[in-house]
């Protein structure tokens, strides 16, 4: 079974939308909103017949999102919708009771033996605002880390390698993001000797895979070369609007294993060192974006750039030293999710790292540099949430006294931020918006123990602090 599991639950009650909702809307209208409150996490789904192929993936095309406000028959959402929700597809909404603010850090996992189930070393299902940092995971069954029906999960500074099985049917994955999961950040990780290092399937949307390093892909049970398995993979059942940026791997595969992938998946400034970029064509997945990628191998049968389907956006891709399409050499875009160079790339002089106008095949990301130098995880480093803009993250606060017998003060807060205080069980016991840069909180009526203070911005958690209450 799963070695570590963070397991929330999906509420049984269903509410129905009463009108069409459209991509980029930040509200939905329901028959009744009485059961919903600001701060609730919900899953919006619909009849996705024709979009998903697999029975196990039905109902996964949608979005997991937090309610910002509730007024009359309208729910206002914390983020914009990433897909249309036509009334003819019978869109519905259900509350999620998630595992929140859990962290797994600074440990090594070794799966000592295989089992007959599709089990994972770390599994998150119906989880929100959770972090996995500095973990080495040795030998997988299905996936080293599986993220299902979750949002705002971050995985960074990890080393995931090897598997008991590399055959089909779900074996040998690094990080699997699936089942409507969205707004997750997979950043600065190292993958080695896996069937699929980074893989999306079953309605996953709005996720970012940034600046990871993957080597030695390997699969069995196929007539294709053993090192030709995709390590950056869209696996079908309508994944859409995801971003792969700054990764170094061996091949991007947009496959048809489980039918079509949805639109607007973006591959930006990645380097592929072996077979390159390949899309299956039965059926093809339309409307993909490929910008500033490098395909470097000149070995016979490698170095591919094969797309099928229609309405792809292509710009500035360097394929074996030649820019494709011709005439798109000038690419000024630096990042599609960062506003400036992130701290984990401080030791990398070239930024952006990959792609035109840089010299072809020059530059390494931090994960590749670390692997070359025998640094497989980064544990104990300051962890900054990647789900907010850089300006939102730049918060320097003081919390005192700590431990406290009752009252404590948080200074240095920017107006507009929010404070949420949770007990050790994850129960919200206090929340307040910052007005003047300082907040006084009284714990005198609560039990002794450890409490967590989340500093919140519009994009999620900016910083988490710990406070101890003791008499």
Regions found by a protein language model. Give the residues of each.
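Autoprocessing Asn-cyclization modules and mimics
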Residues: 1-66, 70, 78-79, 83-84, ...
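Extracellular beta-strand/beta-solenoid scaffold signature
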Residues: 1-9, 25, 85-95, 115-123, ...
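Extended Gly/Ser/Thr-rich low-complexity repeat segments
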Residues: 35-50, 83-102, 421-422, 455
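Right-handed parallel beta-helix
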Residues: 40, 46-70, 74, 100-196, ...
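Cys-His-centered catalytic/binding microenvironment captured across papain-like cysteine peptidases
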Residues: 55-64, 74-125, 237, 283-285, ...
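Catalytic domains of carbohydrate-active enzymes that cleave complex glycans
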Residues: 222-224, 236-237, 242-384
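C-terminal outer-membrane/trafficking sorting elements
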Residues: 390-471
């Amino acid at each position: 079974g799963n070695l570590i599991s963070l397991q929330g639950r999906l509420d049984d009650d269903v509410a129905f939308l009463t009108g069409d909702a459209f991509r980029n809307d930040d509200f939905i209208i329901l028959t009744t909103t009485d059961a919903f409150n600001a701060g609730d996490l919900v899953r919006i789904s619909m009849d996705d017949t024709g979009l998903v192929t697999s029975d196990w993936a039905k109902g996964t095309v949608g979005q997991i999102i937090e309610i910002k406000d509730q007024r009359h028959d309208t729910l206002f959402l914390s983020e914009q919708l990433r897909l249309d929700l036509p009334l003819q597809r019978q869109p519905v909404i259900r509350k999620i009771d998630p595992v929140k603010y859990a962290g797994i850090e600074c440990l090594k996992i070794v799966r000592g033996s295989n089992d007959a189930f599709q089990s994972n070393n770390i599994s998150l299902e119906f989880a929100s605002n959770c972090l996995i940092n500095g973990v080495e995971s040795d030998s997988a069954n299905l996936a080293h880390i599986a993220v299902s029906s979750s949002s705002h999960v971050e995985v960074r500074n990890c080393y995931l390698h090897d598997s008991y099985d590399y055959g089909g049917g779900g074996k040998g994955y690094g990080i699997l993001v699936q089942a409507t999961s969205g707004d997750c950040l997979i950043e600065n990780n190292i993958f080695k000797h896996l069937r699929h290092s980074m893989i999306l399937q079953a309605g996953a949307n709005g996720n970012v895979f940034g600046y990871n390093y993957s080597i030695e892909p390997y699969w069995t049970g196929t007539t294709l070369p053993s090192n030709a398995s995709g390590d950056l993979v869209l696996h079908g059942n309508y994944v859409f609007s995801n971003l792969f940026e700054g990764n170094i791997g061996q091949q991007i595969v947009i496959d048809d294993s489980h039918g079509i992938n949805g639109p607007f998946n973006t591959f930006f400034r990645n380097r592929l060192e072996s077979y390159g970029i390949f899309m299956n064509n039965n059926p093809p997945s339309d409307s993909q974006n490929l910008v500033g990628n490098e395909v470097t191998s000149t070995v016979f049968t490698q170095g591919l750039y094969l797309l099928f389907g229609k309405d792809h956006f292509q710009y500035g891709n360097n394929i074996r030293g030649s820019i494709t399409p011709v005439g798109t050499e000038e690419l000024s875009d630096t990042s599609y999710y960062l506003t400036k160079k992130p701290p984990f790339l401080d030791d990398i002089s070239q930024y952006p790292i990959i792609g035109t106008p840089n010299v072809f095949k020059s530059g390494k990301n931090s994960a590749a540099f670390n692997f070359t130098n025998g640094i497989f995880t980064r544990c104990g480093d300051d962890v900054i949430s990647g789900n907010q803009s850089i300006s939102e993250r730049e918060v320097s606060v003081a919390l005192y006294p700590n431990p406290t017998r009752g009252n404590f003060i948080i200074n240095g807060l920017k107006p507009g931020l929010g404070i949420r205080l949770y007990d050790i069980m994850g129960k919200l016991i206090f929340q307040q918006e910052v007005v003047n840069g300082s907040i006084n909180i009284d714990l005198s009526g609560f039990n002794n123990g450890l409490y967590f203070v989340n500093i919140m911005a519009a994009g999620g958690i900016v910083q988490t602090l710990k406070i101890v209450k003791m008499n």
